Amino acid sequence: MSPLLLLLLCLLLGNLEPEEAKLIRVPLQRIHLGHRILNPLNGWEQLAELSRTSTSGGNPSFVPLSKFMNTQYFGTIGLGTPPQNFTVVFDTGSSNLWVPSTRCHFFSLACWFHHRFNPKASSSFRPNGTKFAIQYGTGRLSGILSQDNLTIGGIHDAFVTFGEALWEPSLIFALAHFDGILGLGFPTLAVGGVQPPLDAMVEQGLLEKPVFSFYLNRDSEGSDGGELVLGGSDPAHYVPPLTFIPVTIPAYWQVHMESVKVGTGLSLCAQGCSAILDTGTSLITGPSEEIRALNKAIGGYPFLNGQYFIQCSKTPTLPPVSFHLGGVWFNLTGQDYVIKILQSDVGLCLLGFQALDIPKPAGPLWILGDVFLGPYVAVFDRGDKNVGPRVGLARAQSRSTDRAERRTTQAQFFKRRPG
C-alpha cells in the first residue's frame, strides 16, 4: 500500500466515531388515530385508579396503560426463531415486555385483532409457565411468562423473558393500534421481578451501555415517527449541548422539576415538583388546579375529562409554556402544544395539557409525554458506578432537513412489517 493511501485510510478511520457503529436504530412509525372511532383521550381519568400487581407479590404501583390509546409512536420487534413480528409501544413508564399469545382465551377479543405469538413456531422457545397479572381499572390482563429470542433493530437473539397475554380485557386493547408493550423503565417496576429487555441486552453483551434515546417526529407529513436509538444517542439528531437531569427515584424516569412558566406571567410548580418523562403518554398532565390555571392563561376552555380546547386559528399567537429542568428552560410554542383534531387550521383544537390528579404515594406528579418530548431528543441513561441514572434533553434538529437521510439510515437497520 502506498504511503499516500495509508495516510488517507488513517485519516478516514480517525474521523469515524466509534460509538456510532455500536448504536442500534429502531424506526418508529407514526399512526394517525381516528377521532371518530375512539376518543383518543379516553381512559385518562382512570389513571389514578390503575394499580399493578403481580401474582408473585410486590408493592402495588401505578401503571397508566389505558393512556396508550392516544400514543402515536410504535415500532416493530421480532420474537422467536424465525422472528414473529409485533408492533409495540416503547414505553419508559413500564418495564415488562408482553404480546398476545395464540393460547389466549377464546373470549379475549383483543387477541383476534392482533398478531399473536405462537410458541410452537419457534425453535428457540423455552417455557417458563409462571403466571403474571396486571390489574387495570377496566379489568385484569393476565397470562404466563415465557422465554425466547428478541430481535430489535440490529440486535438479534437477545434471550428475554416476556409475557404471553392470555386474557386482555376491554375494548382498550382490542382497538389499540399496537400488539403489545416493551417497557424501558427500571427493574423495580417489572411485574414478576423479571429482567427487563434492556437489562438482558446489556448483560448478554449486545449493548455496551444501558442507554437509549428517543427522537420523535411530530411532523404531520407521512407516518415516519422518528427513531429509538439503543446504546446511546445520535448527535446528528440534536443541537448540543445535552442537559442532564438526575433521576430522583429509579422506577419511572422521575426527575425534579424546578418550575413551569406560561409566557412572562403565570408560574406553576413554584416550590419544585416531581415529573416523569414518559414516551407512552401523548399529552402533558399535571395536578388539576395547576393545569386549570395553565389552560386559562393560554385562553383555552374546558371540555370533558380534564381536556381543554382552543380555536386553531389562535395557535401562532399563543404564549410559550416553559419547563425548568436541570437549571435550563425547555420551551414549547403553540405549534408544539396545540393538537389538531382535523387537518385544518380552522375550528377547534385540543390543548396538550390535561388535568390528572395522581394520589399519594405515587403523586402528585407531572407527566411529560410526547407533547413535551416532541421538540427535543431525550436520552435515558441508567448510569454506572461513576454516574447515577439521568435523563438528557436537547433541542431536536429540524425534521424537514434530515427526513430523507433518516429514511435511508432506517432502511439499513430494520424492515418494518407492512400495515
Curated annotation (Swiss-Prot):
Annotated source species: Mus musculus (Mouse)
All residue ranges annotated as the Peptidase A1 domain in the record: 73-394
Q: Does the keyword Protease apply?
A: yes
Keyword annotations from UniProtKB, A to Z: Aspartyl protease, Disulfide bond, Glycoprotein, Hydrolase, Protease, Secreted, Signal, Zymogen
Q: Does the keyword Protease apply?
A: yes
Name the domain of life this protein comes from: Eukaryota
Compartment(s) of residence: Secreted
Q: Which family does it belong to?
A: Belongs to the peptidase A1 family.
**Leader sequence residues:** 1-16
EC number(s): the record gives: 3.4.23.-
Glycosylation-annotated residues: N85, N128, N149, N331
Q: Where is the active site?
A: D91, D278
Q: In which tissues is it expressed?
A: Expressed at the highest levels in the kidney, at a moderate level in the lung, and at low levels in the spleen and adipose tissue.
Sum up the protein's function in the record's words: May be involved in processing of pneumocyte surfactant precursors.
Q: Per its record, how is this protein called by name? A: Napsin-A
* GO biological-process terms attached to the record: membrane protein proteolysis; surfactant homeostasis
Name the gene that codes for it: Napsa
Indicate the enzyme's highest-level EC class. hydrolase
Xref: InterPro entries: Aspartic_peptidase_A1 (IPR001461), Aspartic_peptidase_AS (IPR001969), PEPTIDASE_A1 (IPR033121), Peptidase_aspartic_dom_sf (IPR021109)
Q: Molecular function (GO) terms listed?
A: aspartic-type endopeptidase activity; endopeptidase activity
**A Gene Ontology CC term for this entry?**
lysosome
Give the intrachain disulfide bonds.
C104-C111, C269-C273, C312-C349
Region span, Disordered: 391-419
